[in-house]
Amino acid sequence: MLVSYKWLKELVDVDVTTAELAEKMSTTGIEVEGVETPAEGLSKLVVGHIVSCEDVPDTYLHLCQVDTGDDELRQVVCGAPNVKTGINVIVAVPGARIADNYKIKKGKIRGMESLGMICSLQELGLSESIIPKEFSDGIQILPEGAIPGDSIFSYLDLDDEIIELSITPNRADALSMRGVAHEVAAIYGKKVHFEEKNLIEEAERAADKISVVIESDKVLSYSARIVKNVTVAPSPQWLQNKLMNAGIRPINNVVDVTNYVLLTYGQPMHAFDFDKFDGTTIVARNAENGEKLITLDGEERDLIADDLVIAVNDQPVALAGVMGGQSTEIGSSSKTVVLEAAVFNGTSIRKTSGRLNLRSESSSRFEKGINYDTVSEAMDFAAAMLQELAGGQVLSGQVTEGVLPTEPVEVSTTLGYVNTRLGTELTYTDIEEVFEKLGFAISGSEVKFTVLVPRRRWDIAIQADLVEEIARIYGYEKLPTTLPEAGATAGELTSMQRLRRRVRTVAEGAGLSEIITYALTTPEKAVQFSTQATNITELMWPMTVDRSALRQNVVSGMLDTIAYNVARKNSNLAVYEIGKVFEQTGNPKEDLPTEVETFTFALTGLVEEKDFQTKAKPVDFFYAKGIVEALFIKLKLDVTFVAQKGLASMHPGRTATILLDGKEIGFVGQVHPQTAKQYDIPETYVAEINLSTIESQMNQALIFEDITKYPSVSRDIALLLAESVSHHDIVSAIETSGVKRLTAIKLFDVYAGNNIAEGYKSMAYSLTFQNPNDNLTDEEVAKYMEKITKSLVEKVNAEIR
């Protein structure tokens, strides 16, 4: 949120410096990112009046005689297409500084002396995105009343100071100038004074021209007004200045009024050309799958049923809460305007704007919340401004569907509750003073008091919120500080802390680097790599659409990190994270999710770089699986791997489920190529393991065995098998053969190709036998091998090679 200090001082009497104000606001709850002055670095820029303007033959140049308040006219050569006689312009005289610290000097252009430069706003350092359309390809034209020789800074409000606020979701009330004014007034104990407009309505009723119908529960309220006989023209300079200093491009007086009201009230508005409507009934409804709409930016949007649209005669004319449609755009010939002020479901707007990658000032405010109390007032204010700036005639009444609660919210607490939480000894009088500054009504006594919270502060709902407001306005610096009291105790690690340390040791020993990713993600990514379907826990007031749901896997966030690095030429990555995921089996609005500790890692690129002796070695499934095996060897747990084809985001032929005592605790494998393409990453292998389940196994008592003094005996066996037979199937057949002295099974070769029939493969195993109490004889080992061979033949149809 960009706040003009000049504009702010029109709303509340504050006479401190912007540096002091920024410090005070940051310490009371709204962080200030910085303060900038548009005129910083600029100098010697004055108003010039073009007395004459002659075209230079065979060039695009113009030779201008300019009055800059000096005794003589100043000759300036200008190439702008919109320069002409009789206009007031910005002139940088010799010695002036413009953008990028460029110094203007006297010079000659095509042999003609030029004593300065006629400037565009771009040349003063203003962003192309906020410059009025009429001046985007030429020089800025100043108001007719500008006096030659005067500094241009005050005419364009370039001497203003712009305060950039970082608004958190809980303080969306500060996404308006009135909201910021209320905050500043509370901090300094001042009163706000807001401009009021005198709205004069015609006898003709708006309800006789249009009607409004709501057909979606995502639309809480929809209001419309009609203003006829408007004259569409550029906005006055003061209005353009306010919009540009807030980061918004001026378009024309009608559109600019809606944006001005958005900045003033925080109420998004839209203006339709009524004459372009194909009907008289405005319908707010869900879009239909496959429905299309060309928005104001000229893009054709494919809509889905989750989107909201405003429709007339069953044809969409606006993407509700996000952007208007091109078919009803306000143009220079528009005469009758329909103003819209509505309240849409924030979650729906967030999903639509995120899906279409179409963020706007309106959508961000709908996502975070709207002040119900000023929707109607904002509409009337906009209509009055069109009456004033566009000569419009306002038809009588608003056409409204849907009722919004506007009464204050009652929140009660006690003085004891407040003082206990803050460690203070505040009196009821102190509390009254705080809420008087905030503009909240309070009644009651020290035993119990009730605060009437106006609708503009929809973030306050419980007594803890009242305590926060008291602390903010009373002053955090005034709260007493005490050292914590606790007896000295012998500390020890919890079982989870010990497990984390052991996992971290294995991971870093394998060359993995630890990272920390966001616990918040999109609803789609939240469940992307989940092994079981659970409900999604979404935030009510997310800061951004990309951080709106609690993750149920760590892999998706890790792939975002890999994509970020790969895009910056860092393509050999081995990273891990130990963090929580949030599984929700109940109602996300009523039940807390279950927090599950996980260990996740991702590998991409090369394991070993190419050198003069060896070839480059890329990451593969077995390298990733080896890290998992090393972990469980360290943890002294036996796990099995079973081929997994059910994870949509994982490669069906290179993914395995990890089982501990028959229970699924994770997976390891290659990210599906299509998923990798979506993330714009190369071939990547990942694993995610449930540490919470492992922790319960770690708490079991260990059983130690004596080290035997008798040697082990090994035998190799090679098998010809169908390709569909898995390693797990073979190990299971060997283990269930009834051989008690078998201590180890190790796969050391897999082959398919020449001399092997199509559809078959060769797998070779090393089997280890040992008797802890005696030496094994060859005859005993031979019997064991016979049993194993028989089991393999019967259970997996193996052929001994």
UniProtKB/Swiss-Prot annotation:
Entry note: cofactor = Binds 2 magnesium ions per tetramer.
EC top class, as a word: ligase
> What positions does the domain B5 occupy?
406-481
Gene3D superfamilies of this UniProt entry?
3.30.56.10, Bira Bifunctional Protein, Domain 2 (3.30.930.10), Ferrodoxin-fold anticodon-binding domain (3.30.70.380), Nucleic acid-binding proteins (2.40.50.140), Phenylalanyl-trna Synthetase, Chain B, domain 3 (3.50.40.10)
Cofactor list: Mg(2+)
| Signal peptide (UniProt feature, chain positions) | none
Give the Gene Ontology MF terms in alphabetical order. ATP binding; catalytic activity, acting on a protein; magnesium ion binding; phenylalanine-tRNA ligase activity; transferase activity; tRNA binding
- Where is Mg(2+) annotated to bind? D459, D465, E468, E469
Record's subcellular location = Cytoplasm
InterPro entries in the record, alphabetically?
Answer: aa-tRNA-synth_II/BPL/LPL, B3/B4_tRNA-bd, DNA-bd_dom_put_sf, Fdx_antiC-bd, Fdx_antiC-bd_sf, NA-bd_OB-fold, Phe-tRNA-ligase_IIc_bsu, Phe-tRNA-ligase_IIc_bsu_bact
Which segments constitute the FDX-ACB domain?
708-801
Per the UniProt entry, the Enzyme Commission number(s) are 6.1.1.20
Q: Which SMART domains match?
A: B3_4, B5, FDX-ACB
List keywords of the entry alphabetically: Aminoacyl-tRNA synthetase, ATP-binding, Cytoplasm, Ligase, Magnesium, Metal-binding, Nucleotide-binding, Protein biosynthesis, RNA-binding, tRNA-binding
Known catalytic reactions: tRNA(Phe) + L-phenylalanine + ATP = L-phenylalanyl-tRNA(Phe) + AMP + diphosphate + H(+)
tRNA-binding domain residues are 39-153
Q: What protein does this entry describe? A: Phenylalanine--tRNA ligase beta subunit
Q: What is the lineage of its organism?
A: Bacteria, Bacillati, Bacillota, Bacilli, Lactobacillales
